[in-house]
């Protein structure tokens, strides 16, 4: 039986940009974020209850998100995450004082978004049929993995 793969490719930030590559294989999100020197492996399970998994292997961090009332809520590493929406996605990574708001909009197979305010980082992804919330989740996790989790 051949697995259906939906490739997610794109970048986060501009100078320099962070490469994002992931694929959806049935109920798993697998991929790699970052370049050759700072790359982190991504392995997440998607279920009716939420998303869970690990990023960065042994020295990485856990992802544990629960689906409640149309919102994914939980933890990415030590930070809280709240993510709402499917093709128009909004949310927040972190607490009230040090957190980062994000927004993303899907148009067909393209996803464009921003983490943070005016000086925040933009991201652009090609989704190849994958829902926008998954692309946004990959971008937010990449941001945390490469900008906030220093291991």
PLM region spans:
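Long terminal segments
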Residues: 1-43, 47-52, 58-151
């Amino acid at each position: 039986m051949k697995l259906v793969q939906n490739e997610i490719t794109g970048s986060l930030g501009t100078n320099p940009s962070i490469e994002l590559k992931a694929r959806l294989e049935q109920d798993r999100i697998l991929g790699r974020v970052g370049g050759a020197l700072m790359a982190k492996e991504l392995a997440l399970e998607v279920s009716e209850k939420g998303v869970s998994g690990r990023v960065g292997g042994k020295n990485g961090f856990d992802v544990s998100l629960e689906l409640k009332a149309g919102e994914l809520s939980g933890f990415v590493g030590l930070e809280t995450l709240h993510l709402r929406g499917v093709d128009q996605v909004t949310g927040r990574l972190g607490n009230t004082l040090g957190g980062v708001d994000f927004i993303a909009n899907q148009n067909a197979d393209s996803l464009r978004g921003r983490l943070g305010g005016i000086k925040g980082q933009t991201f652009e992804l090609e989704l190849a049929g994958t829902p926008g919330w998954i692309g946004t989740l990959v971008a937010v996790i990449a941001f945390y993995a490469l900008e906030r989790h220093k291991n």
